[in-house]
Amino acid sequence: MSAPHAQVERADFDRYMVPNYAPAAFIPVRGEGSRVWDQSGRELIDFAGGIAVTSLGHAHPALVKALTEQAQRIWHVSNVFTNEPALRLARKLVDATFAERVFLANSGAEANEAAFKLARRYANDVYGPQKYEIIAASNSFHGRTLFTVNVGGQPKYSDGFGPKFEGITHVPYNDLEALKAAISDKTCAVVLEPIQGEGGVLPAQQAYLEGARKLCDEHNALLVFDEVQSGMGRVGELFAYMHYGVVPDILSSAKSLGGGFPIGAMLTTGEIAKHLSVGTHGTTYGGNPLASAVAEAALDVINTPEVLDGVKAKHERFKSRLQKIGQEYGIFDEIRGMGLLIGAALTDEWKGKARDVLNAAEKEAVMVLQASPDVVRFAPSLVIDDAEIDEGLERFERAVAKLVRG
């Protein structure tokens, strides 16, 4: 019999953890579907989804089953060997997308790191060492490793860690003329989020992505889509590129891919993938049997008309109610996004106060996010039911009313 867990409290974070986070005052201890309970037993409705991660809510039966069954078989073998869940997952991702090859990692940052390394390696092998420059959008977010944080182009994340990486240029998002002016035959890749998440939940314009694809083709550059947040059903298609009809050369996935279990994936073509030959890149835990089994189960549930069509319908339910709240209280001037990745942009009077909205919402037992100090973000479970949406938005409206009225 195992010993009982020692009691911990929020203050223990400040005592023992590196202070790079500022977590909420309460500690979630249990979740079921779109509801979470804290240490005191208080129940909250989850519109945050672990930052667009818990795509099927908490403790989804299919994911619990996959994890517990795999846990009784084998946990880890390293990439000296392969394993059955990883191969099944890779095959299903290939069957469902443009891709012909898959690299499995542990996170979105790792998937992006692999994507950026592959883009440079491919260009080096095919065109020569002078073709290494990467163009990305300003206010992007691609991860926290030194390479990915430099590609992201947000000084608040990249400053203070030594010299910035050379060969990385940032241009305004959705500005095709700026991209056209920046790209050259030295460009190895253009890296874009189909929807900027941390940048404020900004969807790409159709002409922008189409133009980026054309420019990449003209300059023999690879088009890389970071779909860590927008992928795996989040927008009502399995991946956002399918909504736009613009096919990338490399795509990164994570977050919803594991439904709450850590996993990332880089998807690409066979012609490009062959340039990551044996020993050029790797990961000890990437594609481990536990993570792969859970991700396979998540993919099976998400990639169905019932779930994907439901995401589109739920978007309209959220949007219409949030627009009414914005008009009633004068706090939001735009509701934007796609599917169940939604941003409520604050009015001039409330700009910079997204954290205040989050804190007010928590007091009314609903969990939301921010996507900058000016935007409140919603990224709930893809299978949240209408009753929970309505109840959660009622709580959210109470929070907004109290905040606005002081």
From Swiss-Prot:
The lineage of its organism: Bacteria, Pseudomonadati, Pseudomonadota, Gammaproteobacteria, Pseudomonadales. Pyridoxal 5'-phosphate binds at residues 108-109, 141, 226-229, 284. It comes from Pseudomonas aeruginosa (strain ATCC 15692 / DSM 22644 / CIP 104116 / JCM 14847 / LMG 12228 / 1C / PRS 101 / PAO1). This is Succinylornithine transaminase/acetylornithine aminotransferase. InterPro entries: Ac/SucOrn_transaminase_bac, AcOrn/SuccOrn_fam, Aminotrans_3, Aminotrans_3_PPA_site, Class-III_PLP-dep_AT, PyrdxlP-dep_Trfase, PyrdxlP-dep_Trfase_major, PyrdxlP-dep_Trfase_small. Transaminates both N(2)-acetylornithine and N(2)-succinylornithine. The gene is aruC. Keywords: Amino-acid biosynthesis, Aminotransferase, Arginine biosynthesis, Arginine metabolism, Cytoplasm, Pyridoxal phosphate, Transferase. Binds 1 pyridoxal phosphate per subunit. Gene3D superfamilies: Aspartate Aminotransferase, domain 1, Type I PLP-dependent aspartate aminotransferase-like (Major domain).
